[in-house]
Design a protein with these regions (language model features):
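Portal/gating segments that form or line small-molecule/metal binding sites
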Residues: 1-129, 139-179
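Non-cysteine beta-strand/loop elements that form the S-adenosyl-L-methionine
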Residues: 136
């Protein structure tokens, strides 16, 4: 069965707002190396509309191992307002998003990656569809803003399965669900 892997940047205090102000840029060598490795074991992206629109504006004009991979792989967009996603190999998820993602997990293939897409992540979390979290924890404290995990979630047990530290002190922590 395919896994759903959430890969998100987060501050030390768990915030995810204004990520472009404090996270590594998409062309940083360490960023590219680690995300290219993640994508080499994946064949699909699960994206919310806002993340999709940002990615679709940035990646199609770039080339290299990471942009070429992200441009060619399947992209599944959870949106009720985006009618015709134009980025190569993009598909809008229609109807019940958690049900559609559960069906995608059952299909043969490699893992599915969720980048950003805060609302989509929470919908998948509420339906126990996330298998792994790859959190890029940055040495920044915002003190306010939207948290990665919303208040009121049920307790979840996770296992830390990998740690990597890259300059400038970013800890990449990989957790798997204990279910």
């Amino acid at each position: 069965m395919r896994k759903v892997i959430v890969s998100n940047s987060v501050t030390l205090d768990g915030r995810v707002d204004e990520v472009r102000d404090w996270a590594l840029p998409g062309d940083d060598d360490e960023f590219v190396k680690h995300h290219t490795d993640l994508l080499s074991h994946s064949d699909g992206l699960l994206l919310g509309r806002k993340t999709y629109e940002f990615f679709a504006a940035v990646w199609p004009s770039r080339s290299g191992e990471f942009p070429d991979r992200i441009n060619s792989m399947a992209k599944y967009v959870a949106s009720t307002t985006l009618n015709d996603p134009e980025w190569e190999n993009s598909h809008r998820i229609e109807g019940d998003v958690p049900e559609a993602v559960a069906e995608l997990k059952e299909q043969p293939g490699q893992d599915l990656i969720v980048y950003g897409s805060h609302d989509l992540m929470h919908s998948l979390l509420e339906h126990d569809l996330i298998d792994e979290y790859q959190l890029w924890v940055y040495p920044v404290v915002l003190g306010k803003g939207r948290s990665l995990f919303k208040d009121g979630l049920e307790r979840m047990a996770l296992d830390l399965v990998d740690t990597t530290v890259i300059p400038p002190g970013v800890a990449i922590l990989t957790y798997q669900s204990q279910r």
